Amino acid sequence: MQIFKRISMMIGLLLLTATMAFADAKTHKIAFHVDESDPKVMNMALNNVQNVSNYYAGKGEKVIIELVAYGPGLNMFVKGKSPVEDRISVMSMSVDGLTFSACGNTHRKMSEKAGKDVALIDGVGMAPSGVVRLVELQEQGYAYVRP
């Protein structure tokens, strides 16, 4: 009977330790902002996203990243036009905790100008307003990065 008590205590301690370690693990939240139609800026933003993700994964820490593009930067997300389309497609499937958000205001204006709905790269979501989305993320404690 003593052995069962000891085993139960050991299991309890292991569960408590695992729970405490999980509770101590910090979740990093980062918002990236792109508002330029410059491939260098787009690639720098994606490099930053990948580097940050790799860094925290290497430390065993969780990271949530949202890249928001508006204005001329929305070209980053336009299907068939984006100079970084392949990278976005791969990263949207391979980087845990990564979200791409297009500005709905910019998208609407681009679509009106084009006379048709401008298609976005698969995996890119839509925010009603890119600026408002960045404000919301910062209010939620996200660090702000503009490459």
Range-by-range predicted roles:
Residues 24-37, 68-72:
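Acidic/histidine-rich, surface-exposed loop or edge segments in extracytoplasmic proteins
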Residues 63-77, 106:
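Acidic helix-start/capping segments at beta-turn-to-alpha-helix junctions
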Residues 10-19:
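Bacterial N-terminal signal peptides
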Residues 25, 58-63, 95:
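Short helix-terminating capping/connector loops at secondary-structure junctions
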Residues 78-147:
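A cross-taxonomic marker for long C-terminal extensions/tails that follow the last structured domain
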Residues 31-33, 66-69, 99-102, 145-146:
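Structural recognition of the beta-strand scaffold that forms the well-ordered cores
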Residues 33-60:
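N-terminal targeting signals for Sec/Tat export/insertion, comprising classic cleavable signal peptides
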Residues 1-11:
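Bacterial N-terminal signal peptides that target proteins for export
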